[in-house]
Curated annotation (Swiss-Prot):
Organism, scientific name: Chloroherpeton thalassium (strain ATCC 35110 / GB-78)
Catalytic activity: (2R)-2,3-dihydroxy-3-methylbutanoate = 3-methyl-2-oxobutanoate + H2O; (2R,3R)-2,3-dihydroxy-3-methylpentanoate = (S)-3-methyl-2-oxopentanoate + H2O
Sequence similarity: Belongs to the IlvD/Edd family.
Name by which UniProt lists this protein: Dihydroxy-acid dehydratase
Manner of cofactor binding, per the entry note: Binds 1 [2Fe-2S] cluster per subunit. This cluster acts as a Lewis acid cofactor.
Keywords, comma-separated and alphabetical: 2Fe-2S, Amino-acid biosynthesis, Branched-chain amino acid biosynthesis, Iron, Iron-sulfur, Lyase, Magnesium, Metal-binding
Residues that bind [2Fe-2S] cluster: C121, C194
Gene3D superfamilies: IlvD/EDD C-terminal domain-like
Amino acid sequence: MRSDKIKLGFDKAPHRSLLKATGAIQSDEDFQKPFIGIANSYIDIIPGHVHLHDFAKRIKEAVRKAGGIPFEFNTIGVDDGIAMGHIGMRYSLASRELIADAVETVVGAHWLDAMICIPNCDKIVPGMMMAAVRLDIPTIFISGGPMKVGVMADGEKVDLISVFEGVGEYSSGKIDDARLKELENNGCPTCGSCSGMFTANSMNCLAEALGLALPGNGTILAVDPKREALAEAAAKQIMTLVEKDIKPSDLLSRESFLNAFALDLAMGGSTNTILHTLAIANEAGINFDLAELNTLAAKTPYICKVSPATKNVHIEDVDRAGGISAILKELSKLDGVLDLSRPTVTGKTLGENIADAEVKDKAVIHSVEDPYSATGGLAVLFGNLAPQGCVVKTGAVDPKMMQHTGPARIYESQDEAISGILKGDVQAGEVVVIRYEGPKGGPGMPEMLAPTSTIMGQGLGDKVALITDGRFSGGTRGACIGHVSPEAAERGPIAALQNGDKITIDIPNKRIAVDLSDEEIEARLKALPPFEPKIKRGYLARYSQMVTSAGSGAVLKSFD
């Protein structure tokens, strides 16, 4: 066992003495058992994580009962909703790298034999996945589970996005104080990751397709007793993975990631999933061209529409309808979409995992013969405005905005944009541009949920497009195009735009362009002053210097 390095031999007496002091070692026989790291992410200020302290206790008990010795440690976390709309959001994406490094550090320093990862919300899931791939020890993921949907007094279903959009409705006089307060009080009714197909839930669902989690990981509610049963099953299964030495490198391949992308396209997951999946694949030494996603999308139908793409279906409905296994089972009817032979943490192949799955509600999970659209719910656009690509959640775009041409309204930051939108500056037909908010420029590529929700709340969702080198919340809906690469801080073409420039967005044909010649773009870029970092000390200053583009997953530069 790996852990023998810290526990066996006469020279390890000091190590054993320290280990006995933890209370985890109850007898000398325990030194003959595998040491299992419990990578938890309990934190009081994130509703998706407030229950993970007790959740981890149950997992530790199950590990010990199964013959392992559990050692729990915690990572940091950022709640994207609470960090939204102010400087705090700059820390969100950057926290992913800290989490990956922190998990690597604890496991690497203490030579743990295996790991159970307990993430839930946005950056914690991919951060732990990156660490798991990097460490390459037997690992299983068990998330904390989704939140229940909120219900208003009149029976209307609401979620966090309803509250954000309520701010826009309130600012434009569409609702009063009482309505906004009711939304506030009902949007997030329980612990768990927010109830729609937002980034956290999207990533927890993708863990099933990647083969890193047991079936049910992405959709069983945090407050459902089945979640605790799944956690106990994961604790038992980690011992099997240790016994058979099944590691992430045995499970993850290019085909595994394509399976995850196919699921993402079929359920219209968050655009952030592209960023994170690229980063996880990078850790595995697997590189993807963003154009590959469009090729896959062309043969992957969009069959499960969940909030924010619709207001009446949430993650709990997907679970009731058969869960991720049912979506994958439906996709398996199509040739060339899934590789069902890929191994998973269950000890079975993906195909074996979903063999008995069935769609229990066809209003929630459509058949491949009757999709919402014949192509996937995400797309990558290319053109002279985004030579390296940009992404859009097509499943959440109003049909009227799938093709749009309009004048640019430029904002140099998210704060400037929010102020302008709230003042009523944005007019129907315009293309709002928010720049210098990319991985380097932000820094941290902040999410744009506040401006997009305000636009929706003001009734402009089918009249205005928004493009940015930043990114969007998984809860964003509308013609919102993010991850524009290269970013403005790297002298990307988005930095050359001026108010009134004509921008054309053509989602069906995967194109985005500004009506300027290459020569004009180049001349404007040459005339710009050097980029001046917004933050010059601390972690974000270092992050800004080391981060790469969104097109490569916004990972840190390699020094290999």
